[in-house]
């Protein structure tokens, strides 16, 4: 597992108050991890801060799963 993937999963677990074991790549923030719209906004902000990147609103709306978050952050770090 890459460091970005590990970091993204750790942030998701912390922000959503779930166990790290629950944060699997295909997990949906809302359906599987119990996030609401405020949780997802706070999650995006935490990812932006941790990885020193900006996630435009139209992209943030597409980030609905753990894998989507990992993919976006990996692309932004290249």
UniProtKB/Swiss-Prot annotation:
Pathway where it operates: Lipid metabolism; fatty acid biosynthesis
GO biological process: lipid A biosynthetic process
Pfam families: PP-binding (PF00550)
Keywords associated with the record: Cytoplasm, Fatty acid biosynthesis, Fatty acid metabolism, Lipid biosynthesis, Lipid metabolism, Phosphopantetheine, Phosphoprotein
One of the record's GO molecular function terms: acyl carrier activity
Subcellular location: Cytoplasm
Modification sites for O-(pantetheine 4'-phosphoryl)serine: 37
Keyword Cytoplasm: yes
Listed InterPro entries: ACP, ACP-like_sf, PP-bd_ACP, Ppantetheine_attach_site
Record has Lipid biosynthesis as a keyword: yes
GO CC annotation, single: membrane
Modification after translation, per record: 4'-phosphopantetheine is transferred from CoA to a specific serine of apo-ACP by AcpS. This modification is essential for activity because fatty acids are bound in thioester linkage to the sulfhydryl of the prosthetic group.
Domain Carrier: 2-77
Function field: Carrier of the growing fatty acid chain in fatty acid biosynthesis.
Family: Belongs to the acyl carrier protein (ACP) family.
Name of the featured protein: Acyl carrier protein
Organism: Sodalis glossinidius (strain morsitans)
Gene this protein is translated from: acpP
């Amino acid at each position: 597992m890459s460091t970005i993937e590990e970091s993204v999963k750790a942030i998701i677990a912390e922000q959503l108050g779930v166990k790290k074991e629950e944060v699997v790549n295909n997990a949906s923030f809302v359906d599987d991890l119990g996030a609401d719209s405020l949780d997802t906004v706070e999650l995006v902000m935490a990812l932006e801060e941790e990885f020193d990147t900006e996630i435009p609103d139209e992209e943030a709306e597409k980030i609905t799963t753990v894998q989507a978050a990992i993919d976006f952050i990996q692309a932004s770090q290249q």
